[in-house]
């Protein structure tokens, strides 16, 4: 079992879930946890390179900081059930989930579920390539000036997808992604690329 609570502002539960490993290649998780959309969103803030943590595109499309008013501020998390694992001697990693699509600490307001999936291929020890998607129906928690046709409480199409790659070597690491979404009839997209250079350790 895992539990994470934030004491900031009024305080709230961020994560609460339990897991069971059926096979070395298959683990199931149920509860409230990070949505497996994009490479960046599931990452801990401790490992994200940016000063303000997550990138602008991921903040918006993954529903992290409230920059998408329709979805609200949900720290990139949701409630649901997830299966995940590694296949083919860890050359392929997969995640597949059924989520409420309403964010954290809220019951499903439209009885519609989101299907979330991601797939990463690791052809080389230092290279990973893959993508992810969210297909579902949102229920607007606030009005948005960029999407005025959707009112508070309306159900709307909320789809997302992404494609990206990571390169990990001792001196240099690279993470790059293209992500896009559609809320109702309004489309949005973004691109990010980060390079991290490590200085060799001197003894």
Model regions and ranges:
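Outer membrane beta-barrel
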Residues: 1-101, 111-116, 120-131, 194, ...
